[in-house]
């Protein structure tokens, strides 16, 4: 079965193909973000950027398992300079990996330094020009808005100039928890405030003829995050803007719930055609984020990077230990990227429900299983020979490759 359906040109109400929102292409190193390219997987290392060797090792670990863009934190000028050493060591000992630098409080000098060394700079509009909260303030006048807007432009312009001259990119990364005080006074702690915060910086960048931009609207609550991205996409469409969106639920936590929370937010938006690059943020080792990203993309048919297994949940009709057999089949075949393999417990629903699979393993009678190629039954074999005979069938079709040896 081919889960990556050929895109159709006309969306229908019940279309099974995801029609991505058209967005421009933005280059980050050798990776392109935008609707004409696969949805990109990102993560962020935990290491202190001053630890050159540790950071290089962490970036390499992520990249080797499929992380296409890696973010590092740069809280000081010293950290920003260290990124140059990290980039060089990666190039000398491994390969050039697309890097993003995270810049926050009063970050102009830091951003200007790190822009020399990375492929994209992420700034937070709520913190880039920090407004110290005033407990006595009742609101902002138009004159104050204009003054702060000029201050933002003056602070942003050197970075925009640097990135534009180097043909590098910027992410305008809004966080729900760090909106500027004037946005909170004007729009409240709302998706509208998040969107206006991003649009303010977008307009400034466009005034400076800089459009290598990616936008994110992250929040720790999935409903807030989804509302912000939907509104951002609508506002950009209304304004004729086509910037790619970086999706993520920030501070999602760990374990099953962290994964579910991220999948709900990211997967829902992707299913609506919104989103061009994703990060699943877990309070775990960053390496644990990557399989979740690829699983979301595969489940939606947006990227196929693993075997697609179809298996029933088991019931009283099941003629063998379904869970055990599925594990055996997976262990033997999970390196055959691109295949769809079904493991079904009985003949009642098995053939119909697995009809789109490339190969099927179905309980036929007690102690006997049937092997299928597509919809066609090929042979019946004793259960104990089932996995071996499945492999032989795949080999006979010329679709088998030997697994890579474990290092």
From Swiss-Prot:
<keyword id="KW-0411">Iron-sulfur</keyword>
<dbReference type="GO" id="GO:0051539">
    <property type="term" value="F:4 iron, 4 sulfur cluster binding"/>
</dbReference>
<keyword id="KW-0560">Oxidoreductase</keyword>
<keyword id="KW-0004">4Fe-4S</keyword>
<dbReference type="InterPro" id="IPR004588">
    <property type="entry name" value="IspG_bac-typ"/>
</dbReference>
<dbReference type="GO" id="GO:0046429">
    <property type="term" value="F:4-hydroxy-3-methylbut-2-en-1-yl diphosphate synthase activity (ferredoxin)"/>
</dbReference>
<dbReference type="GO" id="GO:0016114">
    <property type="term" value="P:terpenoid biosynthetic process"/>
</dbReference>
<comment type="similarity">
    <text>Belongs to the IspG family.</text>
</comment>
<dbReference type="GO" id="GO:0019288">
    <property type="term" value="P:isopentenyl diphosphate biosynthetic process, methylerythritol 4-phosphate pathway"/>
</dbReference>
<dbReference type="GO" id="GO:0005506">
    <property type="term" value="F:iron ion binding"/>
</dbReference>
<comment type="pathway">
    <text>Isoprenoid biosynthesis; isopentenyl diphosphate biosynthesis via DXP pathway; isopentenyl diphosphate from 1-deoxy-D-xylulose 5-phosphate: step 5/6.</text>
</comment>
<feature type="binding site">
    <location>
        <position position="315"/>
    </location>
    <ligand>
        <name>[4Fe-4S] cluster</name>
    </ligand>
</feature>
<keyword id="KW-0479">Metal-binding</keyword>
<dbReference type="Pfam" id="PF04551">
    <property type="entry name" value="GcpE"/>
</dbReference>
<feature type="binding site">
    <location>
        <position position="312"/>
    </location>
    <ligand>
        <name>[4Fe-4S] cluster</name>
    </ligand>
</feature>
<dbReference type="InterPro" id="IPR016425">
    <property type="entry name" value="IspG_bac"/>
</dbReference>
<feature type="binding site">
    <location>
        <position position="346"/>
    </location>
    <ligand>
        <name>[4Fe-4S] cluster</name>
    </ligand>
</feature>
<dbReference type="InterPro" id="IPR011005">
    <property type="entry name" value="Dihydropteroate_synth-like_sf"/>
</dbReference>
<keyword id="KW-0408">Iron</keyword>
<feature type="binding site">
    <location>
        <position position="353"/>
    </location>
    <ligand>
        <name>[4Fe-4S] cluster</name>
    </ligand>
</feature>
<keyword id="KW-0414">Isoprene biosynthesis</keyword>
<comment type="function">
    <text>Converts 2C-methyl-D-erythritol 2,4-cyclodiphosphate (ME-2,4cPP) into 1-hydroxy-2-methyl-2-(E)-butenyl 4-diphosphate.</text>
</comment>
<protein>
    <recommendedName>
        <fullName>4-hydroxy-3-methylbut-2-en-1-yl diphosphate synthase (ferredoxin)</fullName>
        <ecNumber>1.17.7.1</ecNumber>
    </recommendedName>
</protein>
<dbReference type="InterPro" id="IPR045854">
    <property type="entry name" value="NO2/SO3_Rdtase_4Fe4S_sf"/>
</dbReference>
